Amino acid sequence: MNATTIEQVEALVNAGLDPSTADMSYIKNPITGKYILTVAKPIGNALPCWSMGVLREICLQKGIDLDTTDNAEETISIMVNSIINNLQNS
């Protein structure tokens, strides 16, 4: 299942990401149509490393072992969808 709605992505926030630690925002990948959670404003197509680190930590806490790629946007999209799937199946 893809993260296609803000509500689904918010499930990630409810899983332990603290919105008070940074300015939270969602961006939509125009190619895949998936929402991606990020912090602050992306610079070009790059996403802040902070958000990737937080998402990776949440994945580890949820027992999700993910390979990372050189494409930060793709990696975060995969993490978001994996976490949402994990939450819905738990």
Language-model features: locations:
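Glycine-rich anion-binding surface patch
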Residues: 1-90
